[in-house]
Amino acid sequence: MYKSFTAGTKKEAEFLAAEYNLKRKEKPKDVTVGDAIDGYIANKDGVLSPSTIAGYRNIRKNQLQELMDVPLSKLTNVMVQAAINREAHTLSAKSVRNAHGLLTASVAMYMPDFVFRTTLPAKEHKVKDLPSPKQIIDAVKGTDVELPAMLAMWLSLRMSEVRGIRYKDITENGILTIRNVRIAMAGQIEKEKTKTFHSTRQLVLPERILNMIGEGEPDDYVVNLSASTIYKHFVNTILEKTGKHMTFHDLRHVNASIMLALGVPDKYAMERGGWSTPSTLKNVYQHTFSEERIATDQKIDGYMEGFFKDE
């Protein structure tokens, strides 16, 4: 029997469909692995970050497909291990672990007594040969990805955070508040709050980046390129100019390396990058900065400005 659902948004319709699909099963043994994952995603939507939900939906659609129609009552560790082994041939260890994590969390909602005994691929320790900050700056200069790249490498912003900045998020004295992210899910742009409580943070924009940003209407976005366009243009530009492969997210790693080289204390490194935890940092959602934080910002700005001295 086919049943369609109509709701105010696609997200609400998907929740109703998942809820109906689970309720119509008379016995727990009729619930499949796919049903359980759909139910888990619907249950967590609005609680977990939009990027996490998008990742879950991608896993549901493309990974561990041989398990999706298996009733939970018939699921065995042998089946799970076989599916994981097959995925390990084409996916990275991290991707396999993410898929397994979604599987275990979903099954636990409906069969809390099921014990997984899966052997997962060993974690990979990759040492990437990335371009230097100077090479990156020279490569993107004058391109449509210069501003996104500088925001990511200089201020340690994620792609979704770069795309979520609006002019009203920047005060007259140049303080940027990271409030929202923009993520494309199922072909639709969704504006959501930042990934975690500590992703919501404030940064002092250096004059160079303020000049790149310019002026605009309060509700206008500073960066209007799609995530896929930014990613493709950046990767292709870096490869063409430096001969090295680098993802946009690698810019955050470059930023972390810069802070490490400059001896920036972990407290301020995590604060700038949105990695902080309650045990290391108080709430930073305010318009004042400690003297130590200001000194840290100036130290990083001075280092980055050094790459532009030939202009």
Residue positions per predicted region:
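N-terminal DNA-binding recognition helix of tyrosine site-specific recombinases/integrases
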Residues: 70-119, 158-160
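Long, amphipathic, Lys/Arg-enriched alpha-helical "connector/arm" segment
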Residues: 121-145, 154-157, 208
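Short, charged phosphate-coordinating catalytic segments
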Residues: 109-114, 150-180, 267
